[in-house]
Structure formats: C-alpha cells, structure tokens
C-alpha cells in the first residue's frame, strides 16, 4: 500500500508577464508554467518566485496558481 505523502503538495507556477505581454514581445506563443512542490505547513501563502520565462527570454515573476 502507498504511504500518505504528508503536507507536501504539487503546485503550478505561472508567469505573470506572459499574460499581459503582446505577441510582438514574445519569442513564442503561450504562457510559461513550472510545476514544483511546497510544504503547506511552512509556506501557507501562495508562492512568488523569480524564474526564467522562455517565451519572453528573461527572468520574470512566477506566481502559484494551484
């Protein structure tokens, strides 16, 4: 039987600038998303991390969406 994973949950980080950027600024269409895990007990609020966005070709703010 499988064990319970505990307080760690899988979340998705989405680029905040990709949604508002026009098509001429982007290198390719779409929105940059990363999946990661977080400890719900230590980090109760939503994560905001600077990560590389391949569509805009620069470091941008990525926020937790789920």
UniProtKB/Swiss-Prot annotation:
It holds the Pfam family Ribosomal_L33. One of its GO terms (biological process) is translation. Keywords: Ribonucleoprotein, Ribosomal protein. GO terms for molecular function: structural constituent of ribosome. Coiled coil: none annotated. The keyword Ribosomal protein applies. InterPro entries: Ribosomal_bL33 (IPR001705), Ribosomal_bL33_CS (IPR018264), Ribosomal_bL33_sf (IPR038584), Ribosomal_zn-bd (IPR011332). GO terms for cellular component: cytoplasm; ribonucleoprotein complex; ribosome. NCBIfam families: PRK00504.1 (NF001764), PRK00595.1 (NF001860), rpmG_bact (TIGR01023). Belongs to the bacterial ribosomal protein bL33 family. This is Large ribosomal subunit protein bL33. It comes from Synechococcus sp. (strain CC9311). The gene is rpmG.
